[in-house]
Amino acid sequence: MKLSALYQIFLDCQSVTTDSRNCPDGSLFIALKGESFNGNAFAKLALDSGCAFAIIDEIQYAVEDDQRYILVDDCLQTMQQLANYHRRQLGTRVIGITGTNGKTTTKELISSVLCQAHNVLYTLGNLNNHIGVPTTLLRLKPEHDLAVIEMGANHPGEIKFLCEIAEPDYGIITNVGKAHLEGFGSFEGVIKTKGELYDFLRKKDAITFIHHDNPYLMNISQGLNLISYGTEDDLYVNGRITGNSPYLAFEWKAGKDGELHQVCTQLIGEYNFPNALAAITIGRFFGVETKKIDKALAEYTPQNNRSQLKKTENNTLIIDAYNANPTSMMAALQNFRNMTVPHKMLILGDMRELGADSPAEHQKIVDYIKESNFEKVWLVGEQFAASEHSFKTYANVQEVIKDLQEDKPKGYTILIKGSNGIKLSSTVEFL
């Protein structure tokens, strides 16, 4: 079937699902495959549950003479092509966002600001891979005038591929840091892969929003059409931090002589300052009133274990347990060290996907903790356990929870950070 004909079926269906447990009436089911499942096997169930059509790539799962089955060579590839075709047909302005740290928070901040004046489609959660990006694009409607598309990667070439699907008209890289070194091979590999967004934008002479204070980004920005933000006075948007205990507060202005704005956020961490400036920059570029920009930033509440502050009966928790890498871990520790709060405690989990660099990177974190004045330090995971230190260590989060059930700390401000696979977020209910 030609893509144009398949697109007409998609338009008639209005929505797409890849989950046979979630089949809105009249939707289009796409049979994707995973390590432990084959979506083709659930095509009949999807049709029985209300889907109007099912795209499959294994003919044996089709029911003879049932025209609702659409056979293609590769379901995932078809989904990606369909998403790109849909994006082109609508012509919605697309902002592409990637980076090592903060891309999901920045995407949320940008979307919160833009929604003050525009009808915006944006990536839900962190659906930012080869499946998540087309899934988001297929949600585009004619009424959307902007789309904010998050793009993630853990191997070279992935951002280039996602750019070919989303075809961003504007772009931003939040930062580059030491993450997924196992897949990228080196920090230079991270920079090169994230820079694939710049390569795409450069060819289109598209607008690129850039953090002017970041030397790694500036070094690869040659030939780009730049709009800059940072701390220097003459930038499109510039500002400085005014508070950080515990919430981030800052002031900003547009250009050298712009009106000074004060913003108090509900975000934890000085590392979120550039993310907020990025949202202001993009909001200003797309014509959002400054009062509405400030309001959106002040009212944004972080979710999903990212820079969240939670007060329990016993302690104050800074929950940043969605993910961790050497760059984000060090930034979180430096921020926590600078906070003027009493009785600081750390519960840190291993940083995963670092490959051969893992022992050295964990040791660097441990050495920094040794130099700092934290009252209690608990380290979770085999990499931290193998480092040279005398801090309390746990093999896994279950051991931590067992200790907490017997004798929980009280009166502490506790930073909780580690790779998502360590599952440190499960300690929260016991603190």
Question: Which residues make up each language-model segment?
Answer:
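N-terminal leader/targeting and accessory segments in enzymes
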Residues: 1-81, 85, 338-339, 367-381, ...
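Acidic, Mg2+-coordinating active-site environments of NTP-dependent enzymes
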Residues: 3, 60-65, 172-316, 341-342, ...
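Residue-level signal for inorganic ion chemistry
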Residues: 27, 46, 82, 97, ...
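Active-site beta-alpha connecting loops in nucleotide-dependent enzymes
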Residues: 34-37, 302-305, 322-391, 419
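Phosphate-binding loop of NTP-binding sites
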Residues: 78-212, 216-224, 283, 402, ...
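ATP-dependent carboxylate/acyl-activation modules
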Residues: 97, 304-306, 421, 425-426
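Peripheral docking tails and interdomain loops at the edges
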Residues: 393, 412-429
